Amino acid sequence: MNNTGVWDVVVIGSGPGGYAAAFRASDLGKRVLLIERDEKLGGVCLNRGCIPSKALLHIVKIVNEAQHLSKVGVSFGDPKFDVKKIRNHKNKIISQLNGGISQLAKARKVSVLSGKASFVTNSEILVETKEGDEKIKFKNCIIASGSSSSMLPNVPK
């Protein structure tokens, strides 16, 4: 990425808060760089947290509702779960939403950089990318690093 010049706004983190801030700043005419440590936009919420959980919970809800229909005279056999298909369904939802965020970033002319950001000064950050380190200068920075996923105790990995 050619990072000559100074960015008006750098946003660290591309979760719901980060990409919304980046898009709004761009809509207001700012030159915006969105930095995400993962390869895909969306942060923990989209890639490993809220959205995957909701996709799986939706399946459970449908199965539960189908089982309760027997009370009103509609019966189904015992459910059979194809874990591979369920995983593919979840991954498809994530992929579609990742693509949507990427398209919105492109349409709004928000530049995206994959890497881990750390502050060098109050107007410069260092981004560790797969291609090497990049120094980024900015006027304003929004830290939207969000959350990190955690494992529940006593639940096997």
Regions found by a protein language model. Name each.
Residues 2-7, 23-30, 36-157:
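Glycine-rich flavin
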Residues 13-16:
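Glycine-rich Rossmann-fold phosphate-binding loop(s) that bind the pyrophosphate
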Residues 19:
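Residues forming the Rossmann-fold NAD(P)(H) cofactor-binding site
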